[in-house]
């Protein structure tokens, strides 16, 4: 009988232990486990939200970079266009100036040629008169001399 009383005593002690654990030990353990589960769920949700925000931020940053590149390309294209316009304008002005200088040079050469030609005609006429005076042996009067020179210049 002793064996049965020990067994019943152990059963009562075990039942008291289980009741004590269910009353005082299990609730804090369950509460701690549930809090831990909630913290893990919140952390996972926060991580997922942060991951989504990071993806959105990256997409927005990529979009801004693309806009900046497009704007930079527009500025470069505009600057290139403006540079080409300025070059064409300067080249056109230089061509006009070159033509003006060439025409001015031609005009100066032509006027110098006419002046030299006139000077040469007068010298030839003077030489012709001097030669005629030597041949004739006398001097022709100045009025007749001028008439002869004018006719000779006109013929040359």
UniProtKB/Swiss-Prot annotation:
CDD domains: ATP-synt_Fo_b
Coiled-coil segments on the chain, per record: none
Gene3D superfamilies per the UniProt record, alphabetical: F1F0 ATP synthase subunit B, membrane domain (1.20.5.620)
Short name of any one Pfam family annotated for the protein: ATP-synt_B
Molecular function, one GO term: proton-transporting ATP synthase activity, rotational mechanism
Known role: F(1)F(0) ATP synthase produces ATP from ADP in the presence of a proton or sodium gradient. F-type ATPases consist of two structural domains, F(1) containing the extramembraneous catalytic core and F(0) containing the membrane proton channel, linked together by a central stalk and a peripheral stalk. During catalysis, ATP synthesis in the catalytic domain of F(1) is coupled via a rotary mechanism of the central stalk subunits to proton translocation.
Subunit structure: F-type ATPases have 2 components, F(1) - the catalytic core - and F(0) - the membrane proton channel. F(1) has five subunits: alpha(3), beta(3), gamma(1), delta(1), epsilon(1). F(0) has three main subunits: a(1), b(2) and c(10-14). The alpha and beta chains form an alternating ring which encloses part of the gamma chain. F(1) is attached to F(0) by a central stalk formed by the gamma and epsilon chains, while a peripheral stalk is formed by the delta and b chains.
Name of this chain's protein: ATP synthase subunit b
